[in-house]
């Protein structure tokens, strides 16, 4: 059974390890200086420990950590930015990310709008988010051969 577990400060090294493993292939393909693969330890620690309204959740099956999801919410807990969805490569394509997103929505039932951005040229990621109810809002060029697509999901409750 898949479940979410909130990460704490002591989980920093695990988060860094998962983030690097999950984004290595994307970084190698696009060589983007803002790729999560390159995010430094202190910035990740700040997001995990100090940044207000920033939440990391491990996606777990039994006691095995499959990956993590990171969101940033507004004060009212009505809007959220899905900042990082990191599923370990050996677990990708098996439904863990979709189930993690579904559980995250249950964890934050007051959030009515979910936003994110991903690499437009990475068709698999765009299709993954569309399958999970996200729709494109706009595209911004990042660099030659790489554009960021912004996506939104509205929850009617």
Regions found by a protein language model. Name each.
Residues 45-57:
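A short helix-loop-beta-strand connector motif used in the catalytic cores of GNAT acetyltransferases and
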């Amino acid at each position: 059974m898949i479940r979410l577990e909130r990460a704490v400060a002591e989980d920093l090294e695990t988060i860094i390890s998962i983030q690097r493993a999950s984004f290595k292939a994307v970084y190698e393909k696009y060589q983007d200086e803002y790729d999560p693969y390159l995010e430094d330890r202190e910035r990740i620690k700040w997001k995990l420990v100090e940044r207000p309204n920033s939440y990391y959740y491990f996606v777990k099956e039994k006691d095995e950590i499959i990956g993590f999801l990171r969101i940033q919410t507004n004060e009212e807990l009505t809007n959220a930015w899905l900042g990082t969805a990191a599923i370990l490569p050996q677990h990708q394509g098996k439904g863990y990310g979709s189930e993690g997103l579904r559980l995250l929505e249950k964890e934050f039932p007051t959030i009515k709008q979910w936003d994110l951005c991903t690499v437009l040229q990475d068709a698999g990621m765009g299709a993954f988010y569309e399958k999970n109810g996200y729709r494109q809002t706009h595209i911004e060029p990042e660099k030659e051969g790489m554009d960021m697509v912004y996506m939104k999901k509205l929850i009617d409750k």
